[in-house]
Amino acid sequence: MAKFSAIITDKVGLHARPASVLAKEASKFSSNITIIANEKQGNLKSIMNVMAMAIKTGTEITIQADGNDADQAIQAIKQTMIDTALIQG
């Protein structure tokens, strides 16, 4: 299992556009990828799961990946979050 934690810095939080980009990126990997925030967790490959979590600015999130390509998935998702300005690099 691989994971990383970060604070959401986007002024509107984890909203529809970046959630869609993250779900698309996560879907490229065979690992199970979970986002955890505010004692809730969701499947990062599902935009609806991510949106239902209503993650706001300043929220600490953890992304976990479990599977054969977990390390690669975590690296790609972290970079995607930086590129979409959800978190700071």
Swiss-Prot record:
GO cellular component, one term: cytoplasm
Active site: H15
Main location, first listed in the record: cytoplasm
CDD domains membership: PTS-HPr_like
GO biological process terms held by the UniProt record: phosphoenolpyruvate-dependent sugar phosphotransferase system
Subcellular location: Cytoplasm
Regulation: Phosphorylation on Ser-46 inhibits the phosphoryl transfer from enzyme I to HPr.
UniProt-listed Pfam families: PTS-HPr
Alphabetically ordered keywords of this record: Cytoplasm, Phosphoprotein, Phosphotransferase system, Sugar transport, Transcription, Transcription regulation, Transport
Entry keyword annotation includes Transcription regulation: yes
Annotated ranges, domain HPr: 2-89
Family under the similarity heading: Belongs to the HPr family.
Stated role: General (non sugar-specific) component of the phosphoenolpyruvate-dependent sugar phosphotransferase system (sugar PTS). This major carbohydrate active-transport system catalyzes the phosphorylation of incoming sugar substrates concomitantly with their translocation across the cell membrane. The phosphoryl group from phosphoenolpyruvate (PEP) is transferred to the phosphoryl carrier protein HPr by enzyme I. Phospho-HPr then transfers it to the PTS EIIA domain. P-Ser-HPr interacts with the catabolite control protein A (CcpA), forming a complex that binds to DNA at the catabolite response elements cre, operator sites preceding a large number of catabolite-regulated genes. Thus, P-Ser-HPr is a corepressor in carbon catabolite repression (CCR), a mechanism that allows bacteria to coordinate and optimize the utilization of available carbon sources. P-Ser-HPr also plays a role in inducer exclusion, in which it probably interacts with several non-PTS permeases and inhibits their transport activity.
NCBIfam families: PTS_HPr_family (TIGR01003)
PANTHER family (UniProt xref): PHOSPHOCARRIER PROTEIN HPR, PHOSPHOCARRIER PROTEIN NPR
Protein name: Phosphocarrier protein HPr
Gene source species: Mycoplasma capricolum subsp. capricolum (strain California kid / ATCC 27343 / NCTC 10154)
